[in-house]
Design a protein with these regions (language model features):
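NAD(P)+-binding Rossmann beta1-loop-alpha1 motif at the extreme N-terminus of oxidoreductases
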Residues: 2-52
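Rossmann-fold NAD(P) dinucleotide-binding segment
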Residues: 51-102
């Protein structure tokens, strides 16, 4: 049995700080389902309740708002000795020094950063693990178990690199997409167009970019504001902004020469991908994404079903009986209204007409619901 496997419900009582919502709630529910004894402590708990919870727990998972974490660590750090400590904060600058102090004192610490919102379908989503200090193994194993239960893809980085990496993978994309949205608003108003109109008019490149753009637009503005403000507070973040400005200036100055622009773009691409392997991989992935997107946008069925082995086979058997020609398939794990694990299938089809009522009746006999269909040409 590996050390990761030895992290078992009967050996590790867990305390989740901030377990009432967000990531704390998701982790608490997941660990309870796996059989762990989990207690929840909210950010407004009394010092006595916090001390009691720490004393009774072997693993402390911290999911309270970032600004409150440093106070928790300052006030109760000594009580955390002999325990495992994991945080899942996005911005660690306010308490990173205290985490490193506790690690040097022997607390087993693994900082983490899930790269998706807690309400998302998490299977295959990235989570960063950052063990701190020489005693981090136990906490890192615990983090592996927790995020493994959620089906997430684990990447390990150095804790001191976190801020710079977030500037690259969070600040820069949010910065570009928010300026893109602002420029689109100006252009759409000038042309008397609606944003939805562009989807039916646009090129393949726009449709792929629209996915990232739309995801950011669907989020509250404070999400981008927090990410960008945090990034800009660092010298590295400001360096990236300066590089972006310089690039735009150079493009504008060179825009009267296609050959110079092409050379500029090729040189930049060569800098990030000298051997071309990333570009080849992206060409394949983007083509596959466009094919699936095109199939699903043309004609599709949305089906919600219990998550069990053999369910997809049963659904496809029903569709085959009705001569439904499937062209694409995507799936997403979700939680049903009753708390059960369910899966949503988006199935691309070539049929222009469906015997919807009879299909619905047959699907209902196996516990499956047809959410709707789109049979646009």
């Amino acid at each position: 049995m590996s050390s990761k496997d030895s992290f078992t419900p009967d050996s590790v009582p867990v305390c989740v700080f901030g377990g009432g919502n967000g990531w704390g709630k998701r982790v608490a529910e997941t660990m309870r389902t796996a059989g762990f004894d989990v207690r929840i402590v909210e950010k407004d708990a009394s010092n006595a309740d916090i001390r009691q919870a720490i004393s009774a727990s072997a693993l402390l998972f911290v999911a309270i708002p970032d600004p409150a974490i440093n106070s928790l660590l300052q006030d109760h750090g000594k009580a955390m000795h002999g325990r495992m400590l994991i945080d899942c904060a996005t911005n660690k600058s306010g308490f990173s020094k205290r985490l490193q102090e506790l690690a040097s004192e022997g607390v087993s610490i693994c900082s983490s950063h899930p790269m998706a919102v807690s309400s998302a379908a998490l299977r295959g989503q990235n989570v960063l693990l950052m063990p701190i200090g020489s005693n981090a193994v136990a906490a890192e194993n615990a983090a592996h178990r927790i995020y493994g239960l959620l089906g997430m893809r684990i990447a390990r980085i150095d804790f001191t690199q976190h801020g710079e990496i977030m500037a690259l993978v969070q600040m820069l994309p949010h910065l570009v997409q928010r300026t893109f949205i602002d420029a689109l608003a100006t252009g759409l108003a000038a042309q008397n167009q609606q944003i939805a109109d562009l989807t039916t008019l646009a090129s393949a490149n726009y449709l792929l970019a629209e996915l990232g753009l739309g995801r950011v637009a669907a989020q509250r503005g404070e999400i981008s504001a927090g990410i960008i403000a945090t990034g800009m507070a660092s010298e590295f973040g400001r360096t990236l902004l300066a590089a972006l400005r310089e690039s735009l200036d150079t493009i504008q100055k060179t825009s009267d020469s296609r050959s110079e622009l092409a050379a500029l773009f090729d040189a930049a691409t060569q800098r990030i991908d000298p051997e071309g392997s990333w570009r080849r991989d992206m060409a394949d992935k983007s083509e596959a994404g466009l094919i699936r997107l095109g199939n699903l946008r043309s004609r599709s069925l949305a089906i919600e079903a219990p998550n069990r082995i053999g369910m997809l086979r049963d659904i496809l058997t029903v569709l085959a009986r009705h001569n439904i020609d499937m062209t694409a398939l995507d799936s997403q794990l979700m939680t049903g209204a009753d708390g059960s694990e369910r899966v949503r299938f988006e199935i691309g089809i070539s049929n222009s007409h469906l015997p919807q009522e009879s299909i619905c009746r047959e699907l209902e006999t196996i516990g499956v619901r047809l959410h709707g269909n789109d049979t646009r040409e």
